[in-house]
C-alpha cells in the first residue's frame, strides 16, 4: 500500500541557516548574494534523506526576527522524519531547524475531478531551448524584455525566462498588436505544466523579481544562473485525480529541489465558490 502524502511544516532559523551555509560556502552567488534554496537543498538532504522533503517552500513573515516556516510534501510523517533526523543529522544541522516543532497533516487521497481550489506557487517559469534563439535587434541592454542579455544569442540548451522567449518569438508584424504581459505568459506556462492534472480558472502574478540561483557546476565549485522568480496565485479545477496528486507530490517546473514549484492549496474565494463552472467558461479560455 502506498504511503499517504503529508504536508510538513518545519520551523527554520534563517540566520542560523545563513551561518551554516557560510561555513560550507554553499549558496554564494556572483555579486555576493545568497541563494537560500541551495542551502536548504543540502541541509534537508543531509538531515532527512535526499529528496525526501521536496518540493518545499520557505516562508518568512516580516517582523519575525529571521524565523521562518518550511513547508514540503512528503510520503513520510513527522514522527518518522524526526526519528531519522535524530539518528543521522549532525548537531549543527539541528541548530538550524526546530525538530521538536516539526508537524504534519495527511493530504486527501481521493481528489474529486471538478473540485475547485485556490493555489499559490513560487515558480521559476523558464524554457530550455531546443534550438538557438537570437536576442533580436534592440532587445539587449535597456528596459525591454531582453534587458541584461547584452543582445547575445541564446544557445541550444540554455534555460531562458519564458516571457523573454515569448517576446523574442513574436512575429515581426505583431509589433502593432496587443503587448505581451508577463502575467499571461506565466499563466500559460503554468497551464501547460498542469495539463491533465488541473485547469486554471484564474491566475494573478502577485510578485516578480530576478533571482540569482547557485547551482553545482560541471567542475568543482558553483555557477550562478539568473532567472525569473514569480509568485502566482489563483484558482483551479482538479482534472485527473491521480495526475493532480502527482503534481502536488513532484512539484511544477524546474528547480523543484531548490524551493520552487510547490503548489500550496488555499480556499476558493467565497464569491467564486458560488459560481457555476459555466459562468467562468470564457474566463478559463483566457488563461
Name the predicted role of every residue range.
Residues 1-287:
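RNA-interacting cores
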